[in-house]
Amino acid sequence: MGLTDIFLNLLLFVYPAVFIIYQIILYEISARKQINQEALKYSNLPVLSIIVPIKNEEISVIQGLLDNLSNLIWDKKKLEIIIVSDDNEDYFTKIINTVKVPKDLTVYFYRREKKLGYKSGALQYGFEKATGDLILTIDVDSRLPPNALINAYEKMQSNTCDAIVFQWNGYSSNQYSTLAKGMVVSTLFASKALFEGKEKLKLKIYPVGSGTMFSREALRVVNGWDYRLVQDDLEIGTRLIYNGKNVCASGIPIYVEVPDNFYSFYVQQTRWAMGSAEVLRNRLKYIIKSKISFTQRMDLIIYLLQYTPVIVTFFISTLLSLMLPFRIGHDPLNSPALLFWLVSLGLYASLLLSLALKLGLNLKDSLMGIGRLTAFTVSISPFIVFNFFKGLLKSGNTYVITPKGTVKKTNKLLRIIAIIGVFGLLYLLSSILYIYEGYYVTGIWLLYYSSAYLYTMLLYYKEL
């Protein structure tokens, strides 16, 4: 095996496996961290402002959030809800006239006339209107348990936190969505690993867009959100850390709605890929110059590179497909690195399956959910690549809101599926030719890789 093949195998198998094993380690460490979630009583609570950006949201969803917030344990005289709308004037008026505000809540509705940026701009607008010493950002379809706020505040006080992150627990109102079941499992797994696991290792934590409580002073120091960038949470997180602010994990759940159809999943993941790359481009200097340890800096950068294993795998798989006509003379993937990748993937899958069963899913739903999520993730690799480099090369990108509910077969969706199908057939044809030439390992690998694309092309309609 030559140096080129060694490098190829390191990128294709070892590089993604390292990311997988790192997340496994963080998840296992998070399981050892016990967090007190008993409701605490405070007689002198600060004013808390909850900022909720909305656009084209169903009124029933807005009503559901307000009803949920009215049940939270907090001095309601010291609680204000700030809803920032980017809707047109007619729909905004309809919202105000239709929503029934619970009697004990103070709710302010604002419509942005001058729409600077997207979600980041809406959060900054809300921050400028807020009067609270604490600022909580939350999506309109997220929900909190009754003791969430007061427990989070207690930890902020006891651990001297400038911001505290709630633990993402996925939910879906679509009980028939196999994708949503897989998303619920992976969301909780990632949340435990990336928040509680990192805190246990004394690594730095990024805020999340829905479910972070900030001190007003911390936001003041960094001048709030930068409306020019798409990924509001990662963007502000780098500047908070640069300014020496402490972001903590609470271990307290917030229930966030997960995508329940292919197109919503596609929009969410491609936006996150673009956003993380955009932050990498614009905020890397803040990470490098932060007065934190080398390990902490590297971990923050690795988090922003979380989509690169998908990107590297796509490039190498495509390269392998195009190499065959040149008669390479040997099996390029016949390497022990493949075994390392298989073991890491097996461990990861077993942990996801175990978590799915703990969450109450039966074995069939668990396997189907994890499998469908995996296939969809692989199949959108070309679009992850495009959007990652789009974010890396320029700022001022468009924030596309994750659509909810039933999705129609639009021309855009059909184009996406067509592109997925073309790549799937390319990898399938290449796998057959590699096997025919006697390069069995590479051929089987490409057959495996093509299956995700072909599966999505043939079955995506079941998740619409």
Curated annotation (Swiss-Prot):
GO MF annotations in UniProt: glycosyltransferase activity
Functional summary from the UniProt entry: Probably part of a 4-gene DNA damage response locus in which the upstream ups system, in combination with this downstream locus, functions in homologous recombination to rescue Sulfolobales from DNA-damaging threats.
The protein, known as: Probable glycosyltransferase Saci_1499
Transmembrane segments: 6-26, 300-320, 337-357, 373-393, 416-436, 439-459
Topology in membrane: Multi-pass membrane protein
A matching Pfam family: Glycos_transf_2
Upper lineage: Archaea, Thermoproteota, Thermoprotei, Sulfolobales, Sulfolobaceae
CC annotations in GO: membrane
EC number in record: 2.4.-.-
